[in-house]
């Protein structure tokens, strides 16, 4: 079972809302091993609670609308107070942690990495503003997971 779970979420068809998907995809290509599970999804839902409860750390990566576009913030989150109303079709990180704790007896340490988006209109590419901060988001996530950055591959010489 993975010790770390990274969940990148948002709408991959709404420009900067895809930052969680992009980060999850790039980290998935860079990291290997049984100690990390990486998930890209449209939204958080109660069905994720069991997998979350089986980890030591969960990292959420999402877009937000408040602040200056391209701003990256990090905050630790705690489980919300549990109530049956939390069991809706989609959750915020605090509610997902509450479900994990209530249903499976454990809520791991949790961190949200949020990137302020510039555009949430229809589109499949990040804006240049958000694209520029993606490497920093990946570095922050790897640091939280205690995973070093991948080494650059040496360029092939063609003669």
Locations of the language-model features?
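Short "lid" loop at the C-terminus of a central beta-strand within the Rossmann-like core
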Residues: 118
């Amino acid at each position: 079972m993975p010790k770390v779970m990274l969940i990148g979420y948002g709408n991959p068809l709404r420009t900067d809302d895809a930052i969680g998907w992009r980060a999850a995809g790039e980290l998935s290509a860079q990291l290997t091993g049984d100690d990390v599970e990486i998930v890209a999804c449209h939204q958080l839902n109660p069905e994720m609670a069991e997998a979350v409860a089986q980890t030591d750390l969960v990292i959420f990566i999402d877009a937000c609308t408040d602040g200056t576009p391209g701003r990256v913030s990090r905050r630790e989150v705690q489980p919300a107070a549990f109530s049956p109303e939390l069991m809706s079709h989609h959750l915020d990180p605090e509610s997902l942690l509450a479900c994990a704790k209530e249903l499976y007896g454990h809520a791991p340490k949790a961190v949200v990495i949020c990137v302020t988006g510039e555009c949430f209109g229809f589109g499949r590419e990040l804006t240049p503003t958000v694209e520029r901060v993606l490497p920093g988001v990946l570095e922050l996530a790897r640091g939280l997971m205690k995973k070093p950055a991948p080494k650059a591959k040496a360029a092939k010489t063609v003669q």
